[in-house]
């Protein structure tokens, strides 16, 4: 789970990698944060009830947009599982998410504004309702370890692969794949082991992008 790529999805039943676009949701949060700061600044100057109501309405509208996006994204993912005859849905979870990482203020703001725990709860409910097994696993070390090199998913002083520019991950043998796809395979390996890894055919370099409608807060 992330911001620009809201969810990265891989399976052990097909050579298919899917990224659910998160930029529309990100833009909703950016617009909300910008307008919220403006209204709060006006409130400090005037203490007016009208501005207070504006802030409440803005927040309600933003929350409704976010919740609607999460519902549609979770429905899309569970639908993909059923379509591909997946019986277990594995989701990576970071206890502190990514706020503890040294990121820009804007990125931190985006992470704080996206209720990933709510999204995971929606996924759990919808998947179990369809008879799927739902597993939540800590995603620590999954972004640094090389999935296609079958590197053990744990801390290493030196890693065999490396994340490089433009969100790409390079394996020990120089194979390039999307960094989020690499992390997703490692999340799956934490639960299912190395046997789930498919032969690499280049699909991880250019995964399929899915969009959850067009969102705007304006």
Language model features with spans:
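Well-ordered beta-strand positions
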Residues: 1-2, 170
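Substrate-contacting helices/loops that form the catalytic groove of nucleic-acid
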Residues: 2-120, 197-218
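Positively charged, low-complexity nucleic-acid-binding target-recognition regions
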Residues: 108-218
